[in-house]
Amino acid sequence: MYYPGLVSISFRDHTPAKIALAAYKYGLKHIEWGSDIHAPCADSKQLQFIAGLHSTFDISCCSYGTYFRLGHSPISELLQYIEAAKILGTNILRLWAGRKKAADCTKEERDFLFSECRKAAAIAEEHNVILCLECHRRTYTETKDGALELMQEINSPNFRMYWQPNPDISPEENLNYITSLDPYITHIHVFNWSADQRYSLQEGVDVWKEYLSAMSGNHHLLLEFMPDDRIQSLPGEAEALLELIQR
């Protein structure tokens, strides 16, 4: 089963209230709030305000999109993000794995990153949250081999993956990534880009249908960014997402 939602950083220039209203209006019942602008982990008043929006608009926070970067951010700061996530009403946090893809890491960099990941996973298990790594270029999880190695090494139910297409590789290669990482994937960031161009999701429905057919289990499908970054484009993108889910 798929649950439609929105990543708040799609609209960094808009307020949480406006984003929550738009999500509700266009049938996106779940929001991933970003920690950089909308929901800073140290601002408990703002976090509580956002939690109130969930009741007002009958939506939920499906995840906390942090910019905590394993291997770079002090592991001692992770607890503050976990506390913030719980205020927002979610037990899922998005993290980043380093600043290099696996093939570019030295043994020392790899060993340190994995050590920090093990510490983070232990903290997640203790606090009953799930840490999910962004599937992103210029991080350890850029390639399926790097991501799979990391998942297998850490081997924790509280340490998992997001997935999103890599616009630098082919749809077939993206499908291979999904197939390899499927047991570890939680949420999906949804957009339709090439390496140098953004397109509407409607233009990519067919390839996205293939991506979803390769996945098992339940997933939140979260729109991330608009083709033109305008909130006015949300109705069309939301319509395409809902169409994709209903296929």
Show the residue positions of the predicted features.
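Distinct, well-ordered alpha-helical segments
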Residues: 15-20, 43-47, 51, 73-76, ...
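A short helix->loop->beta-strand "cap" motif at the edges of active sites that frequently abuts
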Residues: 59, 90-91, 129, 217-220
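Acidic/histidine-rich catalytic cores of soluble enzymes
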Residues: 3-4, 30, 64, 119-208
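Active-site groove signature of glycoside hydrolases
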Residues: 90-105, 127, 132-136
